[in-house]
């Protein structure tokens, strides 16, 4: 064990009071403040505060604009679709024709 332990001094978290004039000014989400700051807690109880400016900076960062490396190969979502739009349209038309043919048959036909 180390006998040279140093205690760090804590500093207060800067806060401001915002007085609302109307109930409609309250945020929709419980983890959001009227000023736009988001906050959260970890399972251990640590408070995480995300300032609006920080979140906007993260959104505009180059890392946020690149896709994750381990995405699944989903045609039309993560990779270009394998079938052109015209082929998909042809398949839809064929399905509609089959439904129309099935609807023309009478359900209660009898041979006399």
Swiss-Prot record:
It holds the Pfam family eIF_4EBP. The modification Phosphothreonine is found at residues 42, 46. GO terms for cellular component: cytoplasm. Keywords: Phosphoprotein, Protein synthesis inhibitor, Translation regulation. InterPro entries: EIF4EBP (IPR008606). GO terms for biological process: negative regulation of translational initiation; regulation of muscle hypertrophy. GO terms for molecular function: eukaryotic initiation factor 4E binding. The modification Phosphotyrosine is found at residue 30. Belongs to the eIF4E-binding protein family. Interacts with eif4e1a. Regulates eif4e1a activity by preventing its assembly into the eIF4F complex. PANTHER family: EUKARYOTIC TRANSLATION INITIATION FACTOR 4E-BINDING PROTEIN, EUKARYOTIC TRANSLATION INITIATION FACTOR 4E-BINDING PROTEIN 3. This is Eukaryotic translation initiation factor 4E-binding protein 3-like. It comes from Danio rerio. The gene is eif4ebp3l.
């Amino acid at each position: 064990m180390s006998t040279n332990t140093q205690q760090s001094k804590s500093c207060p978290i800067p806060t401001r009071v915002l007085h609302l004039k109307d109930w409609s000014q309250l945020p929709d989400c419980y983890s959001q403040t009227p000023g736009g700051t988001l906050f959260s807690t970890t399972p251990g109880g640590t408070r995480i505060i995300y300032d609006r400016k920080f979140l906007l900076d993260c959104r505009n960062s180059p890392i946020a604009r690149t896709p994750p490396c381990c995405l699944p190969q989903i045609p039309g979502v993560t990779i270009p679709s394998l079938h052109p739009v015209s082929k998909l349209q042809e398949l839809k038309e064929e399905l509609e024709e089959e439904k129309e043919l099935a609807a023309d048959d009478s359900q209660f036909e009898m041979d006399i």
